[in-house]
């Protein structure tokens, strides 16, 4: 028996991990160019379908579920005596939305006009939204027509803009628009630029991971004819977040970030990324960079390295003490990380190989940066003992990651 995902560019998909956590079958990826040839195969029992084939597969089906007919696209196909297509994305989207907000009587704005947008429209209808507005790049109402949709109650991003590896891009900025809830179907990165704006404005929000897991559960029910509890959905969401999200450390130069990060990496399955060490490997001594090219140049390359690594997953990231002085580093770190500020009294801070201490006192640096460490971080730990601090951070991470 064969089950899997049909699509293109699937190496960053979580689908295999989700279906194998469900435990009913092995799951593989089918990156196919020739659909005619694929649908002639006789050894496939069930597939999920993703970009760019959700509409293209319809011509190969013998029948479709009512939801799939309404939406006009398919994400699940069961092969038996006939080939039947389903749309379980709508169930996943309903699950994601209903945990946070009741759409009944609300104005819903949907960004994008592709297959996922069609699913969002039908989901909003199912949940009895009062008004549904679709905004797109080339449609009748465009992203820049803010006055048309500025009073929306709920915003759903159904575009791929901001998805890995093109992180931190967004089709709109919140400001004039202040919905009561926002949903982004993207799940990699964990927080898109849009969702980080929501956090800043204290707007309830969620990414597409729950939608992805729930639609997979519904597909599994179709494949196996077994009923799966919603508790399984939340358990898988937590496992995926715990595995894939990063732990990032910020704090004063010499506060022990590298040591604590090394212990955390050793005690988890996460890979250690020490930003200062990578800079040294690529560009030479940090002391020399400060002395010859100056701090401004150093901050530029530091941000470049942070941007590169913080979009990846399953890491422990030890940042340099001054990483918080560059505003964009906040967004680099928070897209995939829980950020911890670790601290020590000035008397315990190490001065070794800390060029910033040659021109500034510890007190001056602390006065200039403490508010930045506070703004950048999700949690604070006083690093009296590296092993204890590492243990406490891992425990907190495992609790924090579920939301």
Model regions and ranges:
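Phosphate/diphosphate ligand-binding glycine-rich loop within oxidoreductases
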Residues: 2-100, 189-191, 195-197, 201-205, ...
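Glycine-rich adenosine-cofactor-binding loop
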Residues: 7, 87-90, 97, 101, ...
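NAD(P)-binding Rossmann-fold cofactor-contacting core
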Residues: 127-143, 276-283
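Rossmann-like adenosine-cofactor binding region
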Residues: 141-206, 323-329
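Adenosine-phosphate binding glycine-rich loop
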Residues: 185-245
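NTP-dependent small-molecule kinase module
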Residues: 234-242, 263, 267, 338, ...
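ATP-dependent small-molecule kinase phosphotransfer cores
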Residues: 277-325, 329-334
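A glycine- and Lys/Arg-enriched "phosphate-lid" helix/loop adjacent to the NTP-binding pocket
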Residues: 335-376
């Amino acid at each position: 028996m064969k089950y899997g995902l049909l699509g293109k560019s699937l190496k960053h998909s979580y689908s295999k991990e989700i279906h194998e956590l469900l435990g009913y079958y092995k799951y593989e990826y089918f990156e196919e160019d020739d659909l005619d040839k694929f649908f002639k195969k006789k050894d496939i029992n069930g597939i999920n379908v993703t970009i760019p084939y959700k509409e293209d597969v319809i011509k190969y089906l013998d029948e479709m579920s009512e939801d799939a007919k309404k939406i006009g696209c398919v994400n699940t196909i069961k092969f038996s005596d006939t080939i039947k297509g389903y749309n379980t994305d709508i169930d996943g989207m309903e699950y994601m939305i209903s945990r946070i907000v009741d759409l009944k009587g609300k104005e819903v704005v949907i960004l994008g006009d592709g297959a996922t947008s069609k699913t969002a429209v039908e989901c909003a209808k199912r949940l009895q939204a009062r008004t549904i507005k679709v905004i797109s790049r080339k449609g009748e109402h465009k992203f820049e027509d803010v006055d048309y949709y500025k009073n929306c109650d709920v915003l759903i991003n159904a575009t791929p803009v901001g998805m890995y590896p093109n992180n931190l891009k967004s089709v709109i900025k919140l400001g004039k628009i202040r919905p009561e809830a926002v949903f982004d179907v993207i799940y990699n990165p964990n927080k898109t630029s849009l969702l980080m704006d929501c956090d800043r404005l204290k707007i309830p929000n969620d990414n597409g991971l729950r939608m992805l897991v729930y639609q997979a559960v519904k597909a599994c029910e179709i494949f196996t004819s077994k009923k799966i509890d919603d508790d399984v959905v939340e358990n898988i969401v937590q496992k995926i977040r715990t595995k894939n999200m990063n732990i990032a450390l910020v704090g004063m130069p010499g506060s022990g970030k590298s040591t604590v990060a090394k212990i955390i990496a050793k005690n988890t399955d996460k890979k250690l990324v020490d930003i200062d060490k990578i800079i040294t490997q690529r560009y030479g001594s940090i002391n020399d960079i400060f002395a010859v090219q100056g701090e401004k140049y150093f901050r530029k390359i530091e941000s470049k390295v942070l941007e590169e690594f913080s979009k990846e997953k399953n890491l422990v990231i030890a940042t340099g003490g001054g990483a918080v002085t560059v505003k964009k580093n906040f967004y680099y770190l928070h897209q995939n990380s829980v950020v911890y500020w670790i601290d020590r009294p000035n008397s315990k801070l190490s001065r070794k190989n800390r060029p910033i201490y040659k021109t500034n006192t510890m007190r001056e640096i602390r006065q200039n940066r403490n508010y930045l460490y506070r703004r950048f971080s999700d949690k604070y730990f006083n690093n009296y003992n590296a092993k204890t601090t590492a243990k406490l951070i891992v425990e907190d991470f495992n609790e924090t990651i579920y939301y």
